[in-house]
Design a protein with these regions (language model features):
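Non-catalytic helical/linker scaffolds that mediate oligomerization, partner binding
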Residues: 1-181
Length: 181
C-alpha cells in the first residue's frame, strides 16, 4: 500500500450502474455490497457477474472496487460465506471490508489475493486496535465515525506507515458509538 498525499475519494454504489457512475465522476474507489454478507444486503446489490464487470470497468479507468463483507455471521452462515468468498476472489475486486475477526482469518485463507479493510463496524478508536488488525493482515482500518481529527493524528503516529486510515467525513451518526447501537 502506498502512502498517499491526497485523500482517496471513495463512493458507495448499490448496483453496477451506480459503480460505473461513481467511477465516471471521479471516484478513486467504489465500495459496494453483494447480494449476501454485507450489513446492507439487498436484492439490488451486485451479483458476482456484476462485480467482475464492475472491477474490469473500474480498473480500466484507474479506480478500485471494495466489497462490503462486514456482517457478524452466525454459525449457520460460516460455510456459505467461505463458499461465496471462494467465488468472489476471482472477480477482480480489490478488497474486502470486514468487521468480524473470524471472517478476517477466513478471508486470509480463502481469498489471500484480496486486501483486507477493517470496517467502521469494528469500532476502531485507538492505535492498539489498529495495530492488532494490522497484525491480522488488514491494510486499512476505517476508524469509528466519532473520532476527532486529533485522535486520528494520534493513531496515525503510532501505527505502521503501510496501514491506511480511512475516516468518514459525512453521513449518519449513531446516538451511541457506531456499530454499538
Amino acid at each position: 500500500m502506498q502512502r498517499r498525499n491526497k485523500p482517496e475519494v471513495l463512493a458507495p454504489a448499490g448496483n453496477l450502474r451506480g459503480l460505473k457512475t461513481a467511477v465516471d465522476y471521479g471516484a478513486d474507489a467504489v465500495y459496494c455490497g453483494g447480494k449476501a454478507f454485507g450489513m446492507r444486503s439487498a436484492p439490488k446489490n451486485l451479483s458476482l457477474e456484476d462485480f467482475e464487470e464492475g472491477a474490469r470497468y473500474a480498473h480500466e479507468r484507474g479506480a478500485r472496487v471494495y466489497v462490503t463483507f462486514n456482517v457478524l455471521p452466525r454459525n449457520n452462515e460460516v460455510e456459505a460465506m467461505r463458499e461465496y468468498l471462494g467465488k468472489l476472489k476471482d472477480t477482480g475486486v480489490d478488497a474486502l471490508i470486514v468487521s468480524d475477526i473470524g471472517v478476517i482469518l477466513m478471508a486470509k485463507q480463502v481469498a489471500p489475493n484480496l486486501e483486507l479493510h477493517v470496517s467502521t463496524q469494528a469500532g476502531v478508536t485507538n492505535y492498539q486496535a489498529a495495530n492488532a488488525f494490522y497484525e491480522l493482515g488488514a491494510r486499512r482500518v476505517v476508524l469509528a465515525r466519532e473520532m476527532d481529527l486529533q485522535a486520528v493524528r494520534d493513531i496515525r503516529a503510532r501505527i505502521p506507515d503501510d496501514l491506511d486510515i480511512e475516516c468518514f467525513v459525512h453521513g449518519a451518526m449513531c446516538m451511541a458509538f457506531s456499530g454499538r447501537c
